[in-house]
C-alpha cells in the first residue's frame, strides 16, 4: 500500500492541543519529534507518525518495501516540519495573527538558521526512505480555486518549500479535492495541463473505495483513504480490510468525534 500523511508542518493552531512541535535530528542521527510538556519542558521521542514508523520498521524491516516509508504532503504557509521557513517570517509582511505572536514570543528568531535546521531534518528523512509531495503552498481546494491563484500558489511552493524538501513530481490535493472527474484528465483540462507543465506526474485525491487508480502515459492518479479518527468512528466498515478498528481505538479518546 502507499502510505502518506498530510500537513506535517505543526501549524501554529495546533499549539497546546497535544501535538508535537516539530521534527528534529537527535544525537544519534535519528529523526524524532520534539514535544513541549504542560510545564514547558521539552521531550524528544516518537510522538507522531514519522518516528513511529521509523522505529517500527527497525523491528519489522519486511514492513517497508525496498526501504520506503511513506510520502509527506507538505504546504508552506506556516513553514515545514515545525520550522517557520516561509518568507513572511523573514520579511514580517502579510503575517497572520498567530505568526505575529510567534515572532513576538521568539525575539531571537533566526530565519536563516531555521531554514538550515529544516533542511537537515528533510535530508535525514529522505535518507531513511521518506518522500515529499506538494499539498499546495496554501492548502488550496484545487477544485474551487481559480487557475491563476493555483499558478501563484505553486510558484510559492517551488520558491520557498522545494529548496528545503527538494523538487517533487507528486501533488496530493488538500481537502481531498481533485482537478477532474473520475473519468480522467484530458488535454482541455487547464489545471491539469498547468500542473503537468510544472513537472507533476502523480496526482492523489481522497476516495472512500478500497482502491482507485488510473495509469496513463502522462500521469498516475490514485485515491487515498483517510485513516483518521473521523473515519474510524463513523465508518469503521470502510477500513475492515486493513484492520479491526475496535482493536486500535483508544478508549480514552473523547466521543462522539465532532462531525464535519
Task: Name each region found by the language model.
Residues 1, 9-180:
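Metal-dependent polysaccharide deacetylase catalytic core of the NodB/CE4 family, i.e.
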